[in-house]
């Protein structure tokens, strides 16, 4: 008998428009057993090759098939300390599941759903930690920082994490909405790190509150910079500075971190208009649009300069956005935002067509000379982010010039994540190697931790 791919239960698409509760539930134990039985246990598992942190996927699925849930958890956590997070936010269709043999002619094994189930229902094994006497400072508490902190602490080093915001988690906290990543899940992972002995300090902006040189003077043997990329990329068009224009980072931070628009006690203002245009087509654009629906905008549209085929967002996020009433308007390139008394009063777009492929492999949008206007009162720009140069500038002022590329990202050895400064490493969005997402940031954290451990061996 052929077993069909098991589906998680989802919250009603109308009901979820007005709450921030998780959209998806876990598979049931019975579904987990059925889904695990679908794995072919290939001799050369392509799924593992597609995983940036090399989780031994067939092995943990075999453990599930044999009703050994704890063993499945142990196998995953040998290489990933964040299974509950990755099971929810990783682009599995382009990585592990995208490489699954079953997916060639049918439906891939639901690896992400299985990983999430294991993460939610198991705890990390307690390991004996033998102190090495070495100290490591980690700048940033996002995916790369959390992952590196776990691996470095297991090795016995004293690990101190410095976070610029008042809450821990980085983009997992301020960027990804709770309907995708429940905060209880994130808090549990951080609590586990604290139990291991990792020390955290919030409201510390490295480069301003304290410098790299001061960290070294304070006795840190190594510094790992994983402060993210918090500077939004804007459109550079007329009207972009009007009231009612937000970067996606600002909009999501106000709602996710500060409670604006969803917490009556929030002191962070957020003017809720009627019609919002979200510019972009990635996961952040989907998060912003779906969040806008939930805080009360009457009409939410995503405008993208290519076609649906080229959307870089996860297929699941696109589907969920459509189900929740988000409109998609393709081949629209922003030209101007109209001004009325200092506020957004509509937007002008040029209609595009697709030309030859660009460096990304996607067909390049080309203007047609035809224009349309959209009646909107709010604009959210989700076109990506760049690195904040505050750490590099403060280091340079103290005689530690960190080499960066033309876009301002820290240049690193792709395997070790080492910089040109001795004992200073960098990873995640501040020094990206490959696509910018949670699992690649975790991979960077693991590579950095491995190189740091080798360097600190006595």
Feature-to-residue mapping (PLM):
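A conserved FAD-binding loop/helix module that cradles the flavin
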Residues: 430-458
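Iron-sulfur cluster-binding cysteine motifs and their immediate structural context
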Residues: 41-66, 85-118, 160, 164-167, ...
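Feature captures the FAD/FMN-dependent oxidoreductase FAD-binding
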Residues: 71, 130-131, 135-139, 187-237, ...
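FAD-site-proximal beta/loop scaffold in flavoenzymes
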Residues: 241-273, 357-434
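Glycine-rich dinucleotide-binding loop and its adjacent helix/turn
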Residues: 115-129, 188-208, 232-295, 404-415
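Ferredoxin-type iron-sulfur electron-transfer modules in oxidoreductases and energy-metabolism complexes
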Residues: 16-35, 56-88, 105-129, 255-256
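Rossmann-like dinucleotide-binding cores of NAD(P)H-dependent redox enzymes
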Residues: 161, 165-196, 200, 289-336
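N-terminal Rossmann-like FAD-binding beta1-loop-alpha1 element of flavoenzymes
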Residues: 135-160, 285-293
């Amino acid at each position: 008998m052929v077993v069909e791919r098991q589906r998680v239960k989802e919250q009603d698409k109308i009901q979820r428009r007005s709450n921030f509760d998780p959209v998806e539930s876990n598979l049931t134990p019975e579904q987990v057993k059925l889904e695990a039985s679908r794995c072919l246990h290939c001799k050369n598992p392509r799924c593992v090759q597609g995983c940036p942190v090399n989780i031994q996927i067939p092995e943990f699925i075999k453990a599930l098939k044999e009703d050994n849930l704890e063993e499945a958890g142990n196998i995953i956590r040998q290489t990933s300390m964040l299974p509950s997070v990755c099971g929810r936010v990783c682009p599995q269709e382009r990585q592990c599941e995208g490489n699954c043999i079953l997916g060639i002619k049918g439906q891939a094994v639901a690896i992400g759903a299985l990983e999430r189930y294991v993460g939610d229902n198991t705890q990390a094994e307690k390991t004996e930690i033998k102190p090495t006497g070495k100290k490591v400072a980690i700048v940033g508490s996002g995916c790369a920082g959390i992952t590196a902190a776990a691996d470095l602490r297991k090795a016995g080093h004293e690990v101190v994490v410095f976070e610029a915001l008042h809450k821990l988690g980085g983009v997992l906290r301020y960027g990804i909405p709770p309907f995708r990543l429940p905060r209880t899940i994130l808090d549990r992972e951080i609590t586990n790190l604290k139990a291991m002995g990792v020390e955290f300090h919030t409201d510390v902006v490295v480069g301003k509150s304290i410098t790299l040189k001061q960290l070294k003077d304070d006795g840190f043997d190594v510094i790992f910079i994983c402060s993210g990329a918090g500077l939004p990329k804007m459109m550079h068009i007329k009207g972009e500075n009007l009231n009612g224009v937000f970067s996606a980072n600002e909009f999501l931070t106000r709602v996710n971190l500060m409670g604006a628009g969803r917490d009556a006690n929030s002191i962070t203002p957020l003017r809720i208009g009627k019609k919002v245009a979200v510019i972009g087509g990635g996961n952040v654009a989907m998060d912003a649009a779906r969040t806008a629906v939930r805080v009360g905008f009457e009409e939410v549209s995503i405008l993208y300069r290519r076609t649906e085929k080229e959307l870089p967002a996860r297929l699941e996020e696109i589907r969920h956005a459509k189900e929740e009433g988000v409109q998609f308007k393709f081949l629209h390139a922003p030209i101007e935002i109209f001004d009325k008394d200092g506020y957004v009063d509509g937007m002008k777009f040029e209609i595009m067509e697709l030309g030859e492929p660009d460096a990304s492999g996607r067909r390049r949008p080309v203007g047609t000379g035809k224009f349309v206007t959209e009646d909107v009162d709010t604009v959210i720009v989700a076109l990506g982010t760049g690195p904040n140069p505050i750490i590099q500038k403060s280091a340079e002022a103290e005689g530690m010039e960190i080499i960066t590329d033309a876009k301002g990202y820290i240049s690193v050895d792709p395997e070790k994540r080492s910089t040109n400064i001795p004992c200073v490493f960098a990873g995640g969005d501040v020094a990206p190697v490959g696509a910018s997402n949670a699992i690649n940031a975790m991979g960077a954290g693991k590579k950095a931790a491995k190189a740091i451990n080798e360097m600190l061996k006595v």
